[in-house]
UniProtKB/Swiss-Prot annotation:
This protein's record includes keyword Zinc: yes
Native organism: Saccharomyces cerevisiae (strain ATCC 204508 / S288c) (Baker's yeast)
Low complexity biased stretches: 1-16, 153-165, 402-418, 960-969
Site for Cleavage, residues: H401, N402, N582, N583, A1217, A1218
Protein name: Transposon Ty1-GR2 Gag-Pol polyprotein
Modification after translation: Initially, virus-like particles (VLPs) are composed of the structural unprocessed proteins Gag and Gag-Pol, and also contain the host initiator methionine tRNA (tRNA(i)-Met) which serves as a primer for minus-strand DNA synthesis, and a dimer of genomic Ty RNA. Processing of the polyproteins occurs within the particle and proceeds by an ordered pathway, called maturation. First, the protease (PR) is released by autocatalytic cleavage of the Gag-Pol polyprotein yielding capsid protein p45 and a Pol-p154 precursor protein.
């Protein structure tokens, strides 16, 4: 601040009668914030140095020829307040005072310029430069020494300097603000010193060294009046001048007093922060020093609490005191007094054993720390020290403090307290000395050590007849068993261990000895005055000294509390070692270690563990007998009680004695379980259970939420049920303290009904054991039932209810009765019960047609509460019904050896149990149903393996002509309904409803076979069947080929070589050749089974002949054909070898669907298959390593089973609920804080670079006038909403430079301080890629620019203040912002508006509509990304012209001008671009990935081989619960964020081939299982292996008259969680890939065609926007094309038949697509699936296919 103030006024010139001298203005780059606490002590010195180093330009200091020419006073120096300046004159040292120098009655009448009146003023000579201050000037405010009377300078030395050489005086600067007055006073005092007036400056006591003369008073007044205008004076100065306007001395005196106080505070803070203590000085002196500093700071308003003070003290401890850092740092309530207690004890022990010579040597294997216990009757002291360092500091202590601890030749001056060796110290409490008084032992101020004891001292006791001491270190000639009886004042015996001599070595160098008794059982060390008197020593309490009768002073006495003390340092230590002293003890208990000490020493272990460890010698140095165990049993350690606090223990059976008085149904336990996630809306998410205490009867009720009204309804129901059914009244309900139970609504309800709520205590779930155990039991049963039955999870509550019914009927081992028996109910009739999930057939009493089947397959759940029926789940209708019209599905097969639940049945047992129930299906109906069952619902594989000796035709009762099995073998099996013993589908539609309503009348007759050439799974080979089969003929078609289908399955005549379609092997009987079944995609299966309504791509009836294929509409005109050829010609599509068309025989058309059995979510999707993979032999290439599709046992009959939901893979769920106590996920931080980059940075070179960057940033902030430097604001005066924190962040840029940035904490910015409507725009990546593509095709020059500190060019409109960073130490000050600082919410928008306005108005650019940050004119295109600019132009001079205009306003740096005709390399927004005009452009990130990927800690190349694809089909992500602790979970989530973040950045920039894998793994960031991490590692590994790959562009043919913009679309149907489809699009401009997108469809599609329509609808808007951009940047005509491999989608888009739009949403979407295609001249064409490069966006592909689709555009 001061140097800044000086620089602002350094242009003041010295005007005189003989010269006009001007000084060069000095600019400074000092950071106004950089005033940290560490620099306070240097502040005055730095201020003086700044004054002394101000220089002038030699050329401007020349003196005019006429020495008597008077120049006018500069305008910057205002005239005196009482009038203008009179005629000026000058004076030299060798001349007499002029006439104007005489004293006048009023000082304002003096006719001279004040600084010319200084006795030290000299005019400059003709050839001399402007005078400078001496380079070394003492600080004017330094504390005076006792010898010098002047505070600031020695006048005699100044006079001698004045006689030897001329000294020129510069005037002080002008005062411009009241806040600058303290700094101005310093410069003014310096001015007086240099003017030889240092003697009149007041000292610290307020009085000057000499009397001020009248002339000097006049000079003082006038200079003060001129350079300190009254309007800028502080209030307290004005108050002084209002009393006496000439009392400048009083102002100076008070200013010095204030400055001294500030300096003292700064010095105290620095001293406290740099404390050092190793025992070389007395502990009481160190304590006095510290406590005085703390007291002074507290008195001055700087509060230092105990925690901070203790930390500062402990940080400075060294030597034997260092261990206190580790023994004390865990204590939360530690005080300074307690810390000094241990310091005094160690010092006392250290001094006592300084000269002792131990008579034992420690074994090196002994423990490092030696523990000693010092017992005290008031408070024991426990000391732990290192005996190996006992005498290390001996010589050092003696030299530093003249304290002798040796018996050999003590010096005369040892331990003397003299003024010459003691520095003065200031104390601020009642025990302190006056200013300048010396510190003596009689005035030591101590804190309480133990009660009122003064550590390290002996208490002078006039009533004691003997001297007693607790420590044996000072006893000479000790002897044990003295036989002396000693009693205290209360007549209690004091056991004496030894007697000896106590030897004193006083400061007069005399030695004295008295008798002393040793005992550890006293509170103080007592020194008997009677025994001192016996050796001619008395205590004088008036002088506070011990003296002899002749008046010789021996030692000072210290008064502490109510007693007088003498220091132990006058005692001579004995030569007795510690073990010898222990042998002197006679009491066994006094020689043992106290248990509390051992307990604390051994990490607070319990007494039993410690005793066992000592007994087994696992702890050495002392034995079990060395510890006093008497207090171990009853000892309560407060730290253990706090640190090891646990919940109270529950005694088994303790609950019963409180509830014996209750009758049945009077005492209930209740609890709520939930929520269960990822369920349809109709399914309950919670259940509430009730248990009767007496009978243990249970009730469960489903809940959809935990609202008060929902809970109240259940309570009302259960209370009414108990009252009416059991004639009982509930008296007490026990529950936990959840908000659902403690709300006011339920509390009032219970109070109204007279029920007492009994709540558990806080966090005591074990007290609620009855309800908790019931919930656990029911959930265990639920999981088991769902696993056994295979039913979907949304039926979980049905399993709970089934378990409740059974559990109420089972007897308890304790009571020998069931809950139903205790309640007086009959036992459960098991004949009415079915196994949970038992397959049944339910009668459809209201079919659509008389010829439709009457049976619907379902699963039995539990008996109905409201009827005599059974609750049965019908998957095909997605409903549950309450009915008695059902029949159990039976079968004889079972495979107990494999424990196959799907085959395991107990039909005979079920028949016996249900014998009394008659089936609604007649015997002839059973036979008839079996005859119609032409498609088996069994797993072919399992059927053949179960009965190899008797193969059974599972397709039909008829026998194949080629089947060798006689028809009679099937007769017995055909008499009963075929068993459908399979698992139910795991997942169903989320909109499934649970109701008791049977299917409605309006239903589709049969499932519709959809387009066989489906593309959702990657496409199939074209089959020789109708693509759009008529719905009315589908049944006939299937029926007519039943026998053919059957014949095919049992025929050996079919050869694998007849088709290229993927075949699945099926085991045959008796060693016959394997039969093959063509693989049919899951999409086809779903269409055949699920869809009841007409297919969206259904067309009018056509001939069923396999030779008639319905063609897709194609362009009929020659122009359209040419356009199609033109669009497809330049695309980077794969080159495929020609293949001959293959037709499947008719039997293939009627094969039942075969589903892939999958239990996990697939990385590649559900049931993905690929059209490019052909299996013509048993051997398979490594590149075609697809997972082999197996025949599913879950295949259901599509005719008789009525569209049962096919099995699907499990949902991919982010099971965050399984993670225990996850609170927050911290974002990833890539920058460093100030303390990390500079303060604690151990890398010196890096630290220096960051410091350099820091100063560079500070200078830039000052240069840009980022804030108002004229005023600092008090934090209390500003609205907190407008105050924003700030910080410095540091990072290393990609080019290796180190960057520092001063930013605001916009993340905590208040919403009222910015306009949320303003947006910060940057160039879209598609816009940049489009511009680069056009630049290549048109031979443009590409120039890259950077604008330094861009945001700081934008002004800020709002009134905002920032708080300086913490490391600057200005916590209470604020600065008002003037510029848009980085980090503010509005900074980006302000900069965007600023640069946008400049580009439009000054550079003649215009922004492209719809594409922010893209500007153009007739010659130049600009892409703006914050402060980076990319210029495109055909003429390089046009770019240079824009650069010249930008440099007029902004600090613009040219990164790459782009003028070379050779290959030029760019780094544009992370893309490494190689560009040669007119030839090619390559985009990659090799250097960046080479640097970043190794830092991710991913194991690269673990097997030493490179991956060929980022993933493979057939990989599935398990949904097992993620049991992991919070810290590990956060760590893994952070790792996933880093890995997926980098992958997303790379994929979005140019690696579009990775987007599908990135998108899929990004959905699992919050589910970081081991499997997910491994898949992510594999993706990063592939990126590492292919880091050198580049997106290759070549210049378009010059003959092309048009720009061609193409979007290639693809979709993968239902391969994402919740049956969502994956859609993908790739965009190409003139054959160059400029962008790609892979995402999950926002809505659930019900067919492949719908998914394709959704994908196309996502591509068209962006295609139109890109078309507009291309037309704006390049005036060529443009052709827009859209390619898809779905012919049905093209047919619907081009069709005018609105009947195809069979549902509201997709019908509307398809109609909109049709309008957009026709209205935007968009060409839609078909592309073969094999050539669809967008396939990589929607599914995982085999290596061969992946390479085939990508090697044309990225390699």
């Amino acid at each position: 601040m001061e140097s800044q103030q000086l620089s602002q006024h350094s242009h003041i010139s010295h005007g005189s009668a003989c010269a006009s001298v001007t000084s060069k203005e000095v600019h400074t780059n000092q950071d106004p914030l950089d005033v940290s606490a560490s620099k306070i002590q240097e502040y005055d010195k730095a201020s003086t140095k700044a004054n002394s180093q101000q220089t002038t330009t030699p050329a401007s200091s020349a003196v005019p020829e006429n020495p008597h020419h008077a120049s006018p006073q500069p305008a910057s120096v205002p005239p005196p307040q009482n009038g203008p300046y009179p005629q000026q004159c000058m004076m030299t040292q060798n001349q007499a005072n002029p006439s104007g120098w005489s004293f006048y009655g009023h000082p304002s009448m003096i006719p001279y310029t004040p600084y010319q009146m200084s006795p030290m003023y000299f005019p400059p000579g003709p050839q001399s430069q402007f005078p400078q201050y001496p380079s070394s000037v003492g600080t004017p405010l330094s504390t005076p020494s006792p010898e010098s009377g002047n505070t600031f300078t020695d006048s005699s030395s100044a006079d001698s300097d004045m006689t030897s050489t001329k000294k020129y005086v510069r005037p002080p600067p002008m005062l411009t603000s009241p806040n600058d007055f303290p700094n101005w006073v310093k410069t003014y005092i310096k001015f007086l010193q240099n003017s030889n007036l240092g003697g009149i400056i007041p000292t610290v006591n307020g009085k000057p060294v000499r009397q001020i003369t009248d002339d000097e008073l006049t000079f003082l007044y006038n200079t003060f009046q001129i350079f300190a205008p009254s309007q800028f004076l502080p209030t307290w100065v004005k108050d002084i001048l209002s009393v006496d306007y000439t009392d400048i001395m009083k102002i100076l005196s008070k200013s010095i007093e204030k400055m001294q106080s500030d300096t003292q505070e700064a010095n105290d803070i620095v001293t406290l922060a740099n404390l050092q203590y190793n025992g070389s000085t007395p502990a009481d002196a160190f304590e006095t020093k510290v406590t005085n500093i703390i007291d002074r700071l507290n008195n001055n308003g700087i509060h230092i609490n105990n925690k901070v003070a203790c930390q500062l003290i402990m940080r400075g401890l060294s030597g034997e005191y260092k261990f206190l850092r580790y023994t004390r740092h865990r204590h939360l309530n530690m005080t300074v007094a307690e810390l000094f207690l241990d310091i005094h004890a160690i010092y006392e022990e250290q001094q006592g054993s300084r000269n002792s010579k131990p008579n034992y040597r420690r074994n090196p294997s002994d423990e490092k720390n030696d523990s000693r216990s010092y017992t005290n009757t008031t408070k024991p002291k426990v000391i732990a020290r290192n005996p190996q360092k006992t005498n290390n500091s001996k010589s050092k202590t003696a030299r530093a403090h003249n304290v002798s601890t040796s018996n050999n030749s003590p010096s005369t001056d040892n331990d003397s307290i003299s003024k010459s060796t003691t520095e003065p110290i200031q104390l601020n409490n009642k025990h302190d000395l006056h200013l300048g008084q010396e510190l003596t032992e009689s005035t030591v101020n101590h804190t309480n050590h133990s009660d009122d004891e003064l550590p390290g001292h002996l208490l002078l006791d006039s009533g004691a007849s003997r001297t007693l001491i607790r420590s044996a270190h000072h006893i000479h000639s000790a002897s044990s068993n003295p036989g002396i009886n000693v009693v205290d004042a209360q007549k209690r015996n004091i056991p004496i261990n030894a007697i000896g001599d106590l030897q004193f070595h006083f400061q007069d160098n005399t030695k004295t000895s008295i008798k002393v008794l040793h005992t550890p059982n006293i509170a103080y060390d007592l020194l008997s005055l009677n025994e001192l008197a016996a050796v001619d020593i008395t205590a004088c309490f008036t002088k506070n000294v011990l003296e002899r009768s002749d008046g010789t002073v021996l030692a000072p006495i210290v008064k502490y509390g109510d007693f007088y003390w003498v220091s132990k340092k006058y005692l001579l230590p004995s030569n007795i070692s510690v073990p010898t002293i222990n042998n002197v003890h006679t009491s066994e208990s006094t020689r043992k270690y106290p248990y509390p000490f051992i307990h604390r020493m051994l990490a607070h272990a319990n007494a039993q563990t410690i005793r066992y460890s000592l007994k087994n010698n696992t702890i050495t140095y002392f034995n079990e007998s060395d510890v006093d165990w008497s207090s171990a049993i009853d000892y309560q350690c407060p730290d253990c009680l706090i640190g090891k606090s646990t919940k109270h223990r529950h005694i088994k059976g303790s609950r019963l004695k409180y509830q014996n008085s209750y009758e049945p149904f009077q005492y209930l336990h209740t609890d709520i379980f939930g929520p269960v996630h990822n369920l349809p809306n109709s399914a309950p998410s919670y259940f509430i259970s009730f248990t009767d205490e007496t009978t243990k009867f249970r009730w469960v009720y489903p809940l959809h939420d935990r609202r008060e009204d929902s809970i109240l309804d259940v309570f009302t129901t259960i209370l009414a049920f108990i009252k009416n059914q059991f004639q009982a009244s509930v008296l007490v309900i026990q529950m936990d303290r959840g908000s659902e139970y403690t709300n006011r609504t339920l509390h009032k309800f219970l109070e109204k009904n007279g029920i007492t709520p009994c709540y558990t205590t806080t966090a005591d779930s074990r007290a609620h054991g009855v309800a908790e155990r019931l919930n656990r039991t029911l959930l265990d049963d639920c999981r088991t039932q769902l696993q056994c039955s295979g039913l979907p999870n949304h039926l979980w509550f049905s399993a709970i209810e089934f378990s409740t019914i059974v559990r109420n009927s089972l007897a308890s081992p304790k009571s020998k009765k069931s809950a139903r028996q205790h309640a007086g109910l009959a036992g459960l009739d098991i004949s009415t019960l079915l196994p949970f999930g038992q397959p049944v057939i339910v009668n459809d009493h209201n079919p659509n047609s008389k010829i439709h089947p009457r049976g619907i397959p379902g699963y039995a759940l539990h008996p109905s509460r409201n009827s005599y029926g059974y609750i049965i789940y019908l998957p095909s209708l997605k409903k549950t019904v309450d009915t008695t019209n059902y029949v159990i599905l039976q079968g004889k097969e079972s495979r107990l050896d494999q424990f196959n639940y799907d085959a395991l049945t107990f039909d005979e047992d079920l028949n016996r149990l249900t014998a009394s129930y008659h089936s609604f299906i007649a015997s002839n109906e059973i036979q008839e149903s079996n005859d119609l069952n032409i498609e088996s619902d069994h797993d072919f594989q399992s059927d053949i393996e179960l009965h190899p000796e008797q193969p059974r035709n599972v397709l039909s009762k008829a026998v194949s002509p080629t089947d060798s099995t006689p028809p009679s073998t099937h007769t017995e099996d055909s008499k009963r309904v075929s068993k459908t013993n399979i698992r139910a589908p795991r997942e169903v539609d989320p909109n499934i409803s649970e109701s008791n309503i049977l299917p409605s009348k309006k239903r589709s007759s049969t499932p519709q076979i959809s387009n066989i050439e489906s593309t959702g799974s990657g496409g199939m080979h074209k089959l020789n069947v109708p693509l759009l089969a008529p719905m009315s003929q589908s049944n006939t078609h299937e029926s007519s080929h039943a026998s053919k289908s059957k014949d095919f399955r049992h025929s050996d005549s079919y050869s694998e070589n007849e088709t290229n379609h993927t075949n699945v092997p099926i085991s045959s009987t008796g060693g016959t050749n394997n039969k093959t079944v063509p693989q049919i995609s899951d999409q086809e299966t779903e269409k055949r089974i699920i869809h009841r309504s007409p297919s969206i791509d259904a067309s009018p009836p056509e001939n069923n002949s396999s030779h008639n294929i319905v063609p897709i509409k194609t362009p009929t005109t020659v122009s359209e054909q040419n356009t199609e050829e033109s669009i497809i010609a330049d695309l980077p599509l794969p080159d495929l070898p020609p293949e001959s068309p293959t037709e499947f025989p008719d039997p293939f058309k009627e094969l039942p669907p075969i589903n892939s059995h999958q239990t996990n979510s697939s990385l590649g999707g559900i049931g993905d298959s690929n059209a490019y993979t052909t299996i013509n032999s048993k051997k398979r290439s490594l590149e075609d390593n697809e997972t082999e599709i197996k025949v599913s046992r879950d295949t259901w009959n599509t005719k008789n089973m009525r569209s049962l939901e096919p099995p699907r893979s499990k949902k991919r769920i982010h099971l965050i609920a399984a993670v225990k106590a996850v609170k927050s996920i911290k974002p990833i931080r890539t920058t460093l804080r100030y303390d990390e980059a500079i303060t604690y940075n151990k890398d010196i070179k890096e630290k220096e670079k960051y410091i350099e960057a820091y100063h560079k940033e500070v200078n830039q902030l000052l240069k840009m006038n980022t804030w108002d430097t004229d005023k600092y604001y008090d934090r209390k005066e500003i609205d907190p909403k407008r105050v924003i924190n700030s910080m410095f962040i540091f990072n290393r840029k990609r080019d290796g430079t180190h960057k520092a940035r001063f930013v605001a904490r916009g993340d905590i910015q208040h919403p009222d301080t910015y306009d949320s409507g303003m947006q910060s725009n940057t160039v879209h990546h598609y816009a940049l890629m489009t511009s680069l593509s056009l630049a290549l095709d048109n031979n443009y020059y590409i120039t890259q620019l950077d604008i330094s500190s861009a945001y700081l060019y934008a002004d800020i409109k709002e009134e905002l203040y920032i708080r300086p960073p913490p490391h600057l130490g200005m916590n209470d000050k604020l600065i008002r912002l003037k510029k848009s600082l980085y980090g503010l919410k509005q900074s980006g928008a302000n900069w965007y508006e600023t640069i946008k306005s400049y580009l439009i108005k000054q550079c003649g650019m215009e922004e492209v509509r719809g594409w922010s940050c893209v500007f153009k004119n007739s010659q130049v295109t600009i892409c703006l990304f914050v402060d980076d600019m990319i210029l495109f132009s055909k003429d390089l001079n046009a770019n240079k012209k824009i650069i010249t205009t930008l440099k007029k306003q902004y600090d613009t740096k040219i990164i790459n001008l782009g003028e070379s005709d050779n290959e030029i390399q760019y780094d544009i927004l992370g893309l490494e671009i190689k560009y040669q005009r007119g030839k090619y452009m390559k985009l990659g990130m090799e250097n960046s990935l080479t640097e970043k990927i190794p830092k991710l800690n991913v194991p690269l190349n673990p097997k030493g081989r490179k991956l060929s694809a980022p993933g493979q089909p057939g990989l599935y992500i398990d949904q097992d619960e993620l049991e992991i602790d919070e810290d590990e979970y956060k760590e893994k989530v952070h790792e996933m964020q880093k890995l997926i973040g980098l992958a997303s950045y790379v994929g979005y920039k140019f690696r579009f081939d990775l987007l599908y894998y990135i998108n899929t793994l990004a959905q699992h960031i919050l589910f970081p299982s081991r499997q997910v991490l491994d898949m992510t590692y594999e993706l990063i590994q592939f990126m590492w292996d292919t880091r050198d790959k580049q997106l290759i562009w070549h210049k378009n043919k010059p003959t092309e008259p048009d720009n061609k913009l193409v979007a290639i679309s693809d979709a993968s149907y239902g391969n994402q969680p919740y049956y969502k489809s994956q859609i993908g699009n790739i965009f190409l401009l003139n054959g160059k890939v400029i962008g790609g997108k892979s995402t999950k469809a926002s809505l659930t599609c019900t067919s492949t065609t719908e998914a394709e329509i959704h994908a196309v609808s996502e591509a068209i808007p962006l295609l139109n926007n890109l078309s507009h951009l291309v037309q704006e940047l390049n005036k060529k005509p443009i052709i827009k094309g859209l390619l898809t491999d779905s012919r049905s989608t093209i047919s619907i888009i081009k069709s005018t038949n609105e009947e195809k739009f069979r549902n509201r949403f997709f019908g509307t979407k398809a109609m909109r697509l049709r309008d957009e295609v026709s209205g935007n001249n968009l060409y839609v064409y078909y592309i073969e699936t094999k050539k669809n490069i967008a396939d990589v966006m929607t599914k995982p592909l085999p290596i061969k296919t992946f390479k085939l689709l990508t090697n044309k555009w990225i390699h």
